[in-house]
């Protein structure tokens, strides 16, 4: 009776998924030990390393230079007064102040005068005439208002300014004469402008007051003679022949009251020697209808129409 009620035994295959048998565990361990190892088993993090590494064929980036640190001036612990640097001091000086400084330095140290002369740029005709024009403007503004502008009273008011202008004229004129000035055209242009300024000096009722202007005319006439003779030696005097200087000098002589007649005579003799002076228009090329004049002026053939023959 008990044998009939006893529970039948459970087959062994029902326990395969519940508990491993010792024989299966040992065989499983042995099979895993005999299995060939792969590279992934030795270095499990190699996959992460390869993923984080950059491709071998990617372009190499140039290293960026590190920005240089700016040199920041540290504030002085103790601030005190000090003189300006020379560069800042010169920036505050105007033309008159700078000229005064240079003049005083050259007076105290004469050896600096030569250095300043060689260092300063050579004055041009326009700059020299501008200086003379400034003296003339100062002279004109010094005349008394109203009254006779040629009286002795007016002369005494502007006498010093006349002296300053004539002194500057006497200093600039030799600078533009040969051999110091190698370009004849530059010398002629200066004399033309300087003579115009000299014409504008006033004439006074007292003849004695006009002596300074008359002496200045004599000096400027000598300067014209020097330049005219030098121009005749260069290029066959082409500048005198076709520059119109005979007409300009004749006009200056007429304005000066004949005080430049000596320069006119030298110019006439130079043009006659060169065979180019016929009348007052010789420097312009002679007869406007001549072929020579048309060739020099570039008008040859412009007055005559082009004739076309019939076919």
Curated annotation (Swiss-Prot):
Q: Which Gene3D superfamilies match?
A: Tethering factor for nuclear proteasome Cut8/Sts1 (1.20.58.1590)
Composition bias type Basic and acidic residues, residue spans: 38-50
Checking Pfam families in the record gives: Cut8
Query: Region (Disordered) spans which residues?
Result: 24-84
A GO CC annotation recorded here is:
nuclear membrane
Disulfide partners: none
Extract the PANTHER family matched here: FI02826P
Q: Specify the protein name.
A: Tethering factor for nuclear proteasome STS1
